[in-house]
């Protein structure tokens, strides 16, 4: 009687490489679906120090006649744009690389600051500013606050609307305005106590602190 040959059993091997590859693929796919964006941060460098804001405060107080807030705004806007191009944007890192300056986006940011000044006017009035009597001065103050935040506004638009990092700059401008309010009701009868002169100066000082030290906060 012939002996039947046994067929050798095949040993099953378990490999996790396919599972790992599939898991990595699914994780990468979920990142795309969730719209995960690269990190953004500001380099700790002297480039972010806005020395021009201190110079503008000095000119506003010592050079301009009667604290001309409109002339100060005319000086602020171009200097803020230049500061963003040559200083702040060079210190902004998005996704481990420095972004090139987008000039069309810079123009859009100017319009965004003008539009932003409208809700800022409303907020200032809600905090006690004259409603109609000094509306022009209040709007000038709102424009100053908006354009002081111009580098942050541009960066929000340029970094896919990641606003978390940039909130500190807006907050410090507001804090500067709030602290400077204390001198208005004091009975000193000084010209610089008139609305909105001390608030403008406080906004500039708050912006200076924000942009100079924002990377360290």
From Swiss-Prot:
Keyword list, A-Z: Endoplasmic reticulum, Glycoprotein, GPI-anchor biosynthesis, Membrane, Transmembrane, Transmembrane helix
Top-level taxon: Eukaryota
Location(s), subcellular: Endoplasmic reticulum membrane
Any one Pfam family match given in the protein's UniProt record, by short name: PIG-F
Membrane association type: Multi-pass membrane protein
Biological pathway: Glycolipid biosynthesis; glycosylphosphatidylinositol-anchor biosynthesis
One cellular-component annotation, GO: endoplasmic reticulum membrane
GO function terms (MF aspect): mannose-ethanolamine phosphotransferase activity
Glycosylated residues (UniProt): 102
GO BP term, pick one: GPI anchor biosynthetic process
Residues passing through the membrane, by range: 45-65, 68-88, 107-127, 134-154, 169-189, 197-217
InterPro entries in UniProt: GPI_biosynthesis_protein_Pig-F
Similarity remark: Belongs to the PIGF family.
Free-text function comment from the UniProt entry: Acts in the GPI biosynthetic pathway between GlcNAc-PI synthesis and GPI transfer to protein.
Identification of the protein by name: Glycosylphosphatidylinositol anchor biosynthesis protein 11
Organism (species): Candida glabrata (strain ATCC 2001 / BCRC 20586 / JCM 3761 / NBRC 0622 / NRRL Y-65 / CBS 138)
Recorded name of the encoding gene: GPI11
